[in-house]
Amino acid sequence: MAKLTVKDVELKGKKVLVRVDFNVPIKDGVITNDNRITAALPTIKYILEQGGRAVLFSHLGRVKEESDKAGKSLAPVAKALSEKLGQDVVFPGATRGAELEAAINELKDGEILLVENTRFEDIDGKKESKNDPELGKYWASLGDGIFVNDAFGTAHRAHASNVGISANVEKAVAGFLLENEIAYIQEAVEAPERPFVAILGGSKVSDKIGVIENLLSKADKVIIGGGMAYTFLKAQGYEIGTSLVEDDKLDLAKELLEKAAGKLILPLDHKVANAFAGYTEVKETADQNIPAGFMGLDVANKTIADYNTQLEGAKTVVWNGPVGVFENPDFQAGTVGLMEAIVKQPGVKSIIGGGDSAAAAINLGYAEKFSWISTGGGASMELLEGKVLPGLAALTEK
């Protein structure tokens, strides 16, 4: 990576500003999934071990008005982080002001402070989300000229707490998580070991047009599953019953199929039901057609066997989006079969691009078998699309 990283700067005795992604699910004050906190630990520990004084910034959820603040404080995160680090995490509960400034200035080497939810600044004019220049400058003034961005999950956004701070410090550098995310995803797409197979699931073609187009020019094969497969199948003239479809994208699907010249791999059969919820009948189809009154909710056995064939010998696999409604045990066999087919390839570099695919791998017990699971759904999508991430572009060149 051509950007400075946290290892390239002197940290001892410095107030080091760190953007992390602690946007974790919280229910009744309890964190239900702390993966993002765990993912940030290597960078935080390194800064503290080097004698830096860490000042952490993160958003949590969306905050548009005063009433949105309830349940959006980072207080539970400060507590969880303290337990993971085995040391106190100072939490003044503010995003600005004399109390916050005093607490930061009182930090000693190896100590840590967490600023309150950066999106509390969105209540008055969306200052965080719109990258207000004064806010970026103010937050930058709280440190000693070093900013570490370790929040890959927000790297595709230009906010005050990443791009804004970066513009007002001497050195803006990447943390270990951001560095790894870029290395795995960008290298997989730009310089893959071949054969390179991309797998795209999810519900809408419209969400992934740019990704499909970019990957068709880079990958040896692009496997399409999930809800968006039905738009492609309808474009080819197959019956899709009541399955999810984007009729306004049929011409685009035809164009992509022509451009793909055999590279796009679609399901060969389906597991269908007579309703999405409250269904009374589930069955498998004999081929690519889906009968009237039924909707496709997963792929079936012929397709799973085909996944094994298509992935045979693959050296690089990038997967974004499940191929069925994996949250429902009736419709998770396709996603499980796909994961099995990926992880059994010898010497494969296997990367999951965040979001629902990451949840599927974690919930179904496959996480440890993949080379890398991204922490940022939107950011990884934009990298797969070949876009430049603002949070990364704002970092200091080596």
Swiss-Prot record:
SUPFAM superfamilies membership: Phosphoglycerate kinase (SSF53748)
Pathway assigned to this chain's UniProt record: Carbohydrate degradation; glycolysis; pyruvate from D-glyceraldehyde 3-phosphate: step 2/5
Enzyme Commission number(s): 2.7.2.3
Binding site for substrate: D21, F22, N23, R36, H59, L60, G61, R62, R119, R157
Cellular component, GO annotation: cytosol
GO MF, one annotated term: ADP binding
Reaction(s) catalysed (UniProt annotation): (2R)-3-phosphoglycerate + ATP = (2R)-3-phospho-glyceroyl phosphate + ADP
Residue positions binding ATP: K208, G296, E327, G354, G355, D356, S357
UniProt KW keywords: ATP-binding, Cytoplasm, Glycolysis, Kinase, Nucleotide-binding, Transferase
Major enzyme class: transferase
Domain of life of the source: Bacteria
One Pfam family from the record: PGK
Signal sequence, renumbered to the chain: none
One of the protein's GO biological processes: glycolytic process
Xref: PANTHER family: PHOSPHOGLYCERATE KINASE (PTHR11406), PHOSPHOGLYCERATE KINASE 1, CHLOROPLASTIC-RELATED (PTHR11406:SF23)
Family named by the database record: Belongs to the phosphoglycerate kinase family.
Protein's recorded name: Phosphoglycerate kinase
Annotated source species: Lactococcus lactis subsp. cremoris (strain MG1363)
